[in-house]
Structure formats: C-alpha cells, structure tokens
Amino acid sequence: METYEKIYPDGQITLMAPTGLAAKRMTESCERPAKTIHKTLGLVPADTPSGFEAPGDGQKLAGGLIIVDEFSMVGIHLANFLIDATDCTPGTHIVFVGDVDQLPSVTPGAILRDLIDCGKVHVTRLTKNYRQASGSMIADVAVKVNTGNTRDLHFSKDCVFTEVPENAIVQSVIDEFTKSVGEYGFDNTYVITPTHKSDKDQLSSNMLNKKLQEIINPPVEGRLDAVSGERHFRVGDRVINKKNATDVINGDIGKVVEVISEDVGATLKIDFSGEIIEFPPERLKNLELAYAITVHSSQGCEFKSVIMPISYSHRFMLTRNLVYTAITRAKVKMNLIGNKNAMLASVLNTKTGGVSDLLCARLAAQ
C-alpha cells in the first residue's frame, strides 16, 4: 500500500474481507478501514444461489488498489459480484490474499486455488510468519501438518497435545477452557471443533456451548434471559449469527451487551466488532452460542488461545486442511486434546472437499 501511494498519490485504496471479524483484523493490522465484501458492494440477502443480490446497479468500486484478504473463503458467486463491481480500467490493481491450504469455500468454487494453478495470474508466496512470535511451536507444527510430516511432528511449549481417553475429552476441553480464560481472557479464548449441531456428539459446538455456558455464564436469579427453542442467551454470552441479513452476515461473531424485555420474548443488543445490532425475538433463531465454534466458522479469525478436541469419532472429518486451519487460528497458545492416533491420521488424510468448478481450465485456455 505504501508503494502504491508513492506511485499513485491520489489513488484510492479499498480493503475487504469475507467476514466481519476478518475485516476487523484487517483494519487493525493495516491501520486503515476495511469492510466486508458484502457491505462494500452493497449486497443484500436474496433467494438466489449466492444468497445475495446487488440492488439496482449495486455499488461500484472506483478502481485504484483493491485488496481482498482471506480469499480462500470466497466462492464463485461472491467473486463474480466483486469482479462485476470493479472498474477494470488501466491503473486498477486487485490483490487477493489467502492461504490455499486452508479449508475451501463452503460455497461452489475454489477461486484462489484456480487463480494460482491457471498460470495466468502473478502469484507471490509469503514465507515469513507474522501471526505467531519468532520460534513459536504453533508455526512449526502448522508447517509439519501442512506438509504431512508426521515423523518430525512434536508438541511442546505453546502448541501442546494432551492425550486423554475418549471419555475424558469433553471434561478436559472444559477444564482447559476455564484455565485459558483466566490466563488470556474470555474474549481471547475459543474452542474450535469439527462438528456443529449433533446432539449425539458431545464434542459438537452445540453440546460444548451448553456445557461452557453453564460454567462461564450460568443463570442468575432476577436476570433476564432471551430464549429461542432450547437456547438461552444472556448478557456476556458470545454468539454467532447464522443467517445473512443487511446488517450482519452468516458467521459474524459478537457479544450480548443487553437483554430487553418485550411483550413476547426478549430483544438482544449485540456488539458485532464495535457495531451494536438489535435482534428482536423473531431473529433469535438465527443466533447460536459461540464459546465453541466449528473450524469452518473460525476461518478468517485469529485468537490468542485455541482449544481443539481430537476424537477418533471424528476420524472421517479430520483432514489435513481442517487441522491445519484450526492450528493456524492460534496466535499465542494452541491446545489439542484427545486421541494421538486420530491426530496423526488426520495429517495423512488429504481429502479436501469443496465444490469444484471449471474456472482453472477456462483461465488456462485464454
């Protein structure tokens, strides 16, 4: 950006990311304002394959330097909105930043990988790690996992593997969470798990959230809860939005700051990265607790302390890129808890998932 401003002192710089937390982190690291792609382009929720539409002609990007972070999360629909909105006149430069080895987009298209593989786009690989401190074992373990090197995979110091029996994983995760909250603070401590809603899986984010809320933020007599189905939301709870809307997108994480009694139910005021958004009773169904989140939901985020259960029961879901994605969310401390053999097997499981497209072949043919 500094180089661009020297060459084009009057040029415009636009910073974007797929999620609110990723945009917030981009703002902090670049010391310049960044927004979500959706907000920058003026996209609104719609019953379309992408889940969004650009009303009218939508927002247009006035060229200049456009930088999009965490681009591995972007699928073909969102990428199409972005390119359509860009003024591709001389002097316009688009930089896509992302880690192609993380989990692919949950929507169709592996755009970042296709752009790299097509041979038509200039690619720069960044090799210096800025997230973890120099000498961090988190970075070392992440590299070993990403290259499939189980022989030299060692844990110590700030990246720890605690091997416990399967029936002790849940309690060990809870114990480590409470310990980590005391050391790093609640806002900086997350459990990241492979599974989401299964009530039969005690290590799903749904089940872990119930247990962690009971310990960290239990009910208090005389204090109002907002209730949606079996979920109770209280002041201080960390929550994740699960449905796109005009003011918040799927995957945005916030904290409940107020519960307001209504004639029917209660309204929540939630702080999403500094923006207070109200969720009336009819929107509560779109919220879930976020003491524990899935690996997919953690993409684009970084946390001081991350705890991840590794269970043999998840063996078909534990892939190299899933574990690599989870480990690289941790900035200061990474705790993996569970079955060591399941961990080693995940490093050798190179199944990537995702929905393929023909973009790479079409670009290569140009």
Language model features with spans:
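Short, charged/polar "capping" segments at the starts of alpha-helices
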Residues: A23-K24, P104, D199-D201, A342-S346
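Residue-level "contact hotspot" at macromolecular interaction interfaces
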Residues: K60, H232, D247-N250, H296
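Conserved helicase motor core of P-loop NTPases
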Residues: D87-C88, V100-T246, K255-V259
